[in-house]
């Protein structure tokens, strides 16, 4: 087999594995979230279908995929139909440039656990994951429903504002490392616990986490949907499989965000003491992923004006200040 054929086959297998694993993890994450929220609220959560309620995932999937797929008669039907697909595709494409685990050897060949090791991987991931929200915006706009349009518009204002916060936080990381490659950023933190970038850029870490909550539409910073204000927001008119694709795209983006935080700030997949790197990657990413659930259970939903004031009056000035301090540190 030629090198090109092997490369193409390897990339195809990696893509299939990523889609299969992360689609499954997205479903498992819904079960985990329901259990965590139940614990916070002194409830039991899913426990009737299968051991510990685990088969509830299958029951929910069957219910979701067999529901009637309704397209409103007054909607922009083509855009309404493809928006969920765009959301899911963008979420999975962003995973292509994220190194998941340390490299390993298989049948005498070194395998990189990444589909595309590009030198601007950070830009690629931020760009493609950001497109997920524009699919949400298109879906809300095409629904021709006042709640959907209002949710999409609120979310668009927030994402444009908070992407600036996230970008400024990441520029500080790039200035320190000198590369947009996620592999290079991971290797920069390979000298032990105190080489993790969270110790050099604690403010950038906090800013990026906040921006990530906006990017993934998570409470307490979710403006696209709110039962008390705009019903289900952009998803008000969606049902069945199309709603499920938005759902899968959202949770895949959450998983990608947790992995990205681990790579950027928490030492990535470098080994720690006697703990292998792949175990460290899973543990740290799971810990960050848990924050989504904890924040939803612990904090109330903020009003849109509070979210925007926090962005422009607090977070952007802090991000600019952090960038200036980092620039001075690099120059000196």
Swiss-Prot record:
Query: Is the keyword Thylakoid assigned to this protein?
Result: no
Q: Can you state which reaction this protein catalyses? A: a quinone + NADH + 5 H(+)(in) = a quinol + NAD(+) + 4 H(+)(out)
Top EC group: translocase
A Gene Ontology BP annotation from the UniProt entry: aerobic respiration
Report the membrane topology from the UniProt record. Answer: Multi-pass membrane protein
What exactly does this protein do? NDH-1 shuttles electrons from NADH, via FMN and iron-sulfur (Fe-S) centers, to quinones in the respiratory chain. The immediate electron acceptor for the enzyme in this species is believed to be ubiquinone. Couples the redox reaction to proton translocation (for every two electrons transferred, four hydrogen ions are translocated across the cytoplasmic membrane), and thus conserves the redox energy in a proton gradient. This subunit may bind ubiquinone.
Q: Which NCBIfam families match?
A: PRK06076.1-2 (NF004741)
| Protein name in the entry | NADH-quinone oxidoreductase subunit H
